[in-house]
Amino acid sequence: NPCSCSQSHCCSRYLCMGAMSLFLPCLLCYPPAKGCLKLCRGCYDRVNRPGCRCKNSNTVYCKLESCPSRGQGKPS
């Protein structure tokens, strides 16, 4: 039992756990921190980076007005 005070070397165990808590933070803090980061990035992008954020931004789309209809551009 690492948190027991009755066993020997309890001070060294507590110092070790304290040092580990600095480098390995509580895993319960990870999802809220990740959500906060996503929210902050979204707000920053909305303010400073206007425009489309489509996943398929390399795909070329044709507007209906500029595309020839099926019967019109074909040679007869």
From Swiss-Prot:
Name the UniProt key words of this record, in alphabetical order. Answer: Cytoplasm, Developmental protein, Membrane
Cellular component per GO, a single term: cytoplasm
Q: What is its main location?
A: cytoplasm
Instruction: Provide the topology term for how it sits in the membrane.
Output: Peripheral membrane protein
* Keyword Manganese belongs to the record: no
Pfam assignment, any one: Sprouty
Keyword set includes Ribonucleoprotein: no
Tissue-specific expression: Brain and interlimb region.
What is an annotated GO biological process for this record, any one?
A: regulation of signal transduction
Q: Where in the cell is it found?
A: Cytoplasm; Membrane
Function noted in UniProt: Inhibits fibroblast growth factor (FGF)-induced retinal lens fiber differentiation. Inhibits TGFB-induced epithelial-to-mesenchymal transition in lens epithelial cells.
The UniProt entry's sequence similarity note says:
Belongs to the sprouty family.
Q: What is known of its domains?
A: The Cys-rich domain is responsible for the localization of the protein to the membrane ruffles.
Q: Which disease is it linked to?
A: Overexpression during skeletal development causes a severe chondrodysplasia in which cartilage cell differentiation is inhibited.
Q: Which PANTHER family match?
A: PROTEIN SPROUTY HOMOLOG 1, SPROUTY
Q: What is this protein called?
A: Protein sprouty homolog 1
The species this protein was found in: Gallus gallus (Chicken)
Q: What is the lineage of its organism?
A: Eukaryota, Metazoa, Chordata, Craniata, Vertebrata
Q: Which gene encodes it?
A: SPRY1
